[in-house]
Amino acid sequence: MGFWQQILESRQIFLKIVHKFKLNSIKGFLSLFLVGVSLSVAIAACSGNGASDSSTSTDAGGSTAKPVSANNQDVRLTLVSFAVTKAAHDAIIPKFVEQWKKEHNQNVSFEQSYGGSGSQTRAVIDGLEADVVHLALGLDVDKIQKAGLISPGWEKEFPNNGVVSKSVAALITRSGNPKGLKTWADLAKDDVKLITADPKTSGIARWNFLALWNSAMKTGGGEQKALDFVTKVYKNVPILTKDAREATDIFAKRGQGDALINYENEIILAQQKGEKLDYIIPDVNISIDNPIAIVDKNVDKHKNREVAEGFVKYLYTPEAQQEFAKVGFRPVEETPQTKELASKYPKIKNLGTVQDYGGWDSIQKKFFEDGATFDKIQAKK
């Protein structure tokens, strides 16, 4: 029965009641009043049902959207990342929040934590309930996996083996490059002092070591040549600092050493802040790949997996990759949108990868475990 047909029939019933009862009697008046109240409730119920059946929502573009679910509650994500990604994420997150709201009619808020990749890894293992981690190297994600927080095979869940940002190694020199450093090989000269952190305690120092080893392997050398070369370089390291920040302080503030190895993106970001640096990007280099992963145990606890996956996928879009490129990271994939930004980076003729050396598990065992290659190199100093 239609809404207006119900109203007409109710009106006819009401008129019959009026005719039957005498309005001058109290009993008749009360009966009429109660019937009127019941009729009003019935009409209101009919009206409510009619409005519900035709309910839709319209977005800003004028298109009709599905009704919003009563369970479509606000969602919070916790992002834990290594320090130098902050500028990029600060630009990316509002864009993702806006897009998710438009497509899902759901509000998303973020809690963010930034710091050294190693310390962030330990914090997550010790109880920082990250939903998404963006770290400096895959070895750190593997540690969280081994702690039971991330499911095995995390690197296959997203494109590029889970790598969402990348850079290469850069060689910073003193102003004017007085030692005339041009390639990695120059670091083995007797009169050159290199400042770097200990690769057994620092993530960036592991990349530094791989850049040196890779340079020997990619220029026609074998394992023995690489070992001899890297041994000579580390003999030129006066002190191994505990982390990259301390290495930078010793080089920049204390004036020690002739060269410092750092990420290219860190140098670009420093230049954007007005710092003047002399540096070289060797054309034989290592791809410094920064992976991202969902912390499965935490998203299952927080029941926000869908949004976490949506955020990670958004980081691979041209819009997000542009923001990474603006602060010095190289795009993980060249697209028409990122091609212009990518053109500002020096070309790398021979680029090595972690996969060239068996992945992080193999690298850790071969080079950085107790008694492995790096300890043997240090024993020769």
Question: What is each of the regions a protein language model found here?
Answer:
Residues N71, Q145-K218:
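A conserved helix-loop-strand patch within extracytoplasmic ligand-binding domains
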Residues T219-V284, P291:
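Ligand-binding pocket segment of bilobal, Venus flytrap-like solute-binding proteins
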Residues P94-H104, A185-D249:
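Ligand-binding cleft/hinge of the Venus flytrap
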